[in-house]
Amino acid sequence: MKTIFTLLVLLTTVAFAPNTKEKGYDIGDVATDFKLKNIDGNSVSLSDYKDAKGFIIVFTCNTCPYAVAYEDRIEALNKKYAAKGFPVIAIMPNNVKTKPGDSMKAMQIRAKEKGFTFPYLMDADQSIYPQYGATKTPHIYVLESTDRGPVVEYIGAIDDNYKDASLVKTKYVENAVDALLNGVAFEVHKTKAIGCSIKL
């Protein structure tokens, strides 16, 4: 009887244990291409960038204070790396019914105010961010173009200080992209994304 009780307890524990396996891409996975509407009305895909060595995919938005704090740094990444073959592609993943401040019109206004030089796309049906496994804004994925397709090489935060760019000690994205451009290994492939939860 005691054995049966113990088994029941174990089965119940397993049945109700949280699923800790992260969904989405991991390091080394090949990212699927997408086709999303840009703020200029055109659709953008990774395959549009025939000569790209890789991509800096940024899930971001207008309404999250963390995302706003990183806007200038995201623009700086594009200015530094787009010409070297690693353009920034920003994707707004939030449900606009939940966050009207992230509507396409609001995205267009914000991009103009900030002078964004990168595509700012809307994940209108919220189908792309789950593929990546993004949970925050901002959430970064550095991809490297290979014969297999765009391979995920870094996932996480842009750097180690969202509050003050002048106090940043480690620039995770820059370190990853620089290493990929130079064909050398780098240590930090994953960090914790700091930001607001993506709104459903």
Question: Model-predicted segments: where are they?
Answer:
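Bacterial Sec-dependent N-terminal signal peptides
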Residues: 1-22
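N-terminal "domain-start" segment that seeds a small globular fold
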Residues: 19-47
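Short active-site neighborhood of thiol/selenol oxidoreductases, capturing the structured segment around
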Residues: 47-68, 177
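Loop/turn elements at helix/coil->beta-strand transitions in domains of secreted/extracellular proteins
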Residues: 52-54, 83-88, 114-119, 137
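Short, thiol/selenol-centered motifs that function as redox-active sites or metal-ligating centers
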Residues: 61-70, 140, 196-199
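Structural microenvironment flanking redox-active thiols in thiol-disulfide oxidoreductases
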Residues: 68-113, 124-130
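Short, internal strand/loop/helix patches
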Residues: 108-148, 152
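Thiol-/selenol-based redox modules, centered on thioredoxin-like
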Residues: 142-200
